[in-house]
Amino acid sequence: APVKQALLDAHIGKDVYGSYEDGILQPFFSIVAKNADENEKEKFLSIIRGTLKDIVKNGMDRKAIEAGINYFEFRFREADFSSFPKGLMYGIDVFDSWLYDENKPFAYLQQLAIYDELKKLAKEGYFENLIQTYLLDNTHASIVTLIPKTGLAAENDAKTAEKLQKYKESLSKEEI
């Protein structure tokens, strides 16, 4: 939340969110600022880095970390997958670990012990170290800017319709 709040306070984007994709061989973390000015890329990066450095230096809010861990532990114990069927979600979890290690198909289902471990590690600066190692010191990063073009879908539809019309005109009655 501190990175999101810093970006919003600086008016970088109208909506800011982060995500972590771990169900692949090379997991990645992303921070997205929707409706941001493309000319503020450097400011975007500077705010993120500055906020993360401050978190590492001053530590994270311990109560917020504990609340987050408790939230996910509760969801895990309750098997709360919102509107998704339990079996489907367990299957996806099994697949995520099995895909890259055929000897550990059930590794992601045996998560309960990790919550106590995370609570202990949080008191020892574990999350700050993760931020330093995997975000601040990581040289494998990129910034991607997507700029919408008004009317692009309609333009593509018109091109496709024209192409299909020309193709249809090239066919005989039997081929149609």
Predicted regions and their residues:
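Core subunits and conserved enzymes of cellular information-processing
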Residues: 131-134, 176
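Structured ligand/cofactor/substrate-binding pocket environments in proteins
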Residues: 1
